[in-house]
Amino acid sequence: MNLLKQIPKVDKVLSWEGVQTLLETHPRPVVMKAVRNVLEVLRAIVLREEGDAGLFTDEAIMKRVNRELDEINSLNLKRLVNGTGVVIHTNLGRSPLPESVRQTLNEIAFGYSNLEFDLATGERGSRYSHVEEILCELTGAEAALVVNNNAAAVLLALSSLAAGREVIVSRGELVEIGGSFRIPDVMRQSGAILREVGATNRTHLQDYSAAVATETGLLLKVHCSNFAVVGFTAEVSAEQLVELGRQHSLPVMADVGSGNLVELSRRLGCNEPTVQEFVSAGVDVITFSGDKLLGGPQAGIIVGRRELLATMKKHPLLRAVRIDKLTLAALEGTLQLYRDERRALQEIPTLRMLALSKEELAETAKRLAARLQKVVPPVVTLALVEGFSQVGGGALPLLQLPTTLISVSVGDKSAQEIEKVMRLSPVPVIGRIFKGAFLLDPRTINEEDISALTAALQGIVP
């Protein structure tokens, strides 16, 4: 405990020449915060009976103050390297945007724009008009509307079309969409009355039909994109639900979630329905995300019948969930690529990464490991192992994409120790641990990441 006496007071540290130099270029409150944080850490070290006298020299404390000041001044939201192989990683920002969107964002962010100004008439315009035409073109729908995320899209649609009335939905489709947000909760918040039908694993058309009453306002289908029920199962198709809706003059709504706009089945060996299929089936209102399989920014997209979307456009809630100009610019830029499907598959990072073959990834991993091995310390060993990538983002939960992983080993360091060092690098590198090994998946690592990845690997050994 005598070491506590060696910890200087804040005022004394502030009087040091090195700190005085910092005060010339940094606000005093910020420097004081850095000093206090460092001294508090030193006190905690002493109380844990760790460390030695070398921690309390003026030079050692000054180094800590400089590091702490850098940390305080750094942005919390920062770029990192996704080496997990999870393409649409919810915690890592989901879909990276296409390179072609970068210039558009720069122009819109740092200047004025015609966000709500009609250049043709010189009068007030609508922000939603910028993407409505292209969304209708790509999906075949009559009308389109965009808000800030898919949960907001569902909330707006139900609030506009079914508040105070029953919404019939299969019990097996009452999904949790992440972050403890559940479809039943969103429905209740909208003012709609939840009417569950069927069983968890099997729901039939008769279940919906028997539940239709004068209180019914809407039939809802939720595409279960973030989980799968296998075995003894049955579900009602969109076409069947639409036919039932027509018989009772009820609108049918589908929450498609993942927002797939291209045929993925032959490329990935999966059966993920497209938004266009729901439109062709006659579904009246369809909602989906912009930052999942679509590969754009976070947004909630609504397409469907013109008169129903007109009702939503007049609802007061729309103002609270409206899309901002930067998201709108990024979304329009991404959607433009879908006019040429081949271009979309090549230039939208999410689609490009998903389409990489096992052979392509094996060659990429081989080249990357050889390239890195030349510049990392000798104690760092890189090896190739076969494995699988995941789609992520609540899409295609059963799909495993074959890949070749790079296993990183460093002397007697554990995988957890390696993971921590990589994660705390100036540009964090996030990998995964499997069977006691720290692994990097080249599927989600691009050329721009290599310098940061190299620096992180070089920093493993002090």
From Swiss-Prot:
GO CC annotations, alphabetized: cytoplasm
Molecular functions (GO terms): L-seryl-tRNA(Sec) selenium transferase activity
Keywords: Cytoplasm, Protein biosynthesis, Pyridoxal phosphate, Selenium, Transferase
One Pfam family here: SelA
NCBIfam families: selA
Family, per entry: Belongs to the SelA family.
Protein known as: L-seryl-tRNA(Sec) selenium transferase
Source organism of this protein record: Geotalea daltonii (strain DSM 22248 / JCM 15807 / FRC-32)
Gene name of the encoded protein: selA
